[in-house]
UniProtKB/Swiss-Prot annotation:
It comes from Enterococcus faecalis (Streptococcus faecalis). Disulfide bonds: none annotated. This is Antitoxin epsilon 2. One of its GO terms (biological process) is negative regulation of cell killing. It comes from the Bacteria.
Length: 90
């Protein structure tokens, strides 16, 4: 599978966005001293899901799949901001 400039650029954007989203949720979990083994907590489940999603080998994906993965991380970015903000207000 050939690696093009566009594909490499897309992968770099996904890597930056996924790290940002994952770190936001991880910081929330750590700052609130949540039990990372307690799968009843939404934030812990989200953290686990994001960790698994980060393990995908992006260089093995076709460009079209990278676009879908990018959209997934955009959605998780919005979602994590929403739920973590609501938790702070409550």
């Amino acid at each position: 599978m050939a690696v093009t400039y566009e594909k490499t650029f897309e992968i770099e954007i996904i890597n930056e966005l996924s790290a940002s989203v994952y770190n936001r949720v991880l910081n929330y979990v750590l700052n609130h001293e949540l039990d990372t083994k307690n799968t009843r907590l939404l934030e812990v489940n989200l953290l686990n899901q994001l960790e698994v999603a980060q393990e995908v080998d992006l260089f093995q994906q076709p460009f079209e799949e990278l676009q879908a993965i990018h959209e997934y991380w955009r959605s998780m970015n919005q979602y994590s901001k929403q739920i973590l903000t609501k938790e702070k207000v409550a």
